[in-house]
């Protein structure tokens, strides 16, 4: 009887301590710490690679879509060239008798009213008046009237009717 009990006990004891390998134990791949370290390393490498790719793409887009400083400087007018090419307009002394286009007695650039005896400049083409300092600063970056946006440069093209002799 002891033999029968020993045989019966032996399969139970071996079942209590099973040998677990990757084919017989389904939890084996998740229990090995070296596999977890390798998986974490691969995941970390993938995240870093994705970050590098994203930053490279951002830099490329910023480089190609953003104009360079050299092209921006080409579009800005040169103040010295603008001063030399700006037509000279006479400086007048403001008085209430002075008639300006639009009948406004204020500078459209600084929005302050003209005072008696103040120096102003009147543009020849549109007859709008401005403070001397205001219009010089305006014309150093632009070539149009601040009020009506008319070009300050005169057009030299004459109409054909001006050549007809009667």
Swiss-Prot record:
Annotated localization: Membrane
According to UniProt, this protein's pathway is: Protein modification; protein ubiquitination
Record CDD domains:
RING-H2_EL5-like
- Which SMART domains does the entry link to? RING
Record's keyword annotation contains Zinc = yes
Stretches the record annotates as Disordered: 71-90
Q: What is this protein called?
A: RING-H2 finger protein ATL79
> How would you describe this protein's topology in the membrane?
Single-pass membrane protein
Please give the catalytic activity noted in the UniProt record. Answer: S-ubiquitinyl-[E2 ubiquitin-conjugating enzyme]-L-cysteine + [acceptor protein]-L-lysine = [E2 ubiquitin-conjugating enzyme]-L-cysteine + N(6)-ubiquitinyl-[acceptor protein]-L-lysine
Q: Which GO terms describe its molecular function?
A: transferase activity; zinc ion binding
Q: Where are the zinc fingers (RING-type)?
A: 107-149
Q: Where is the composition biased (Low complexity)?
A: 81-90
Query: What remark about domains does the record contain?
Result: The RING-type zinc finger domain mediates binding to an E2 ubiquitin-conjugating enzyme.
* One of the GO biological process terms: protein ubiquitination
Q: Which family does it belong to?
A: Belongs to the RING-type zinc finger family. ATL subfamily.
E.C. no: 2.3.2.27
Q: Signal peptide: which range, if any?
A: 1-16
Q: Which residues cross the membrane?
A: 41-61
Q: Which GO terms describe its cellular component?
A: membrane
Q: Which UniProt keywords apply?
A: Membrane, Metal-binding, Signal, Transferase, Transmembrane, Transmembrane helix, Ubl conjugation pathway, Zinc, Zinc-finger
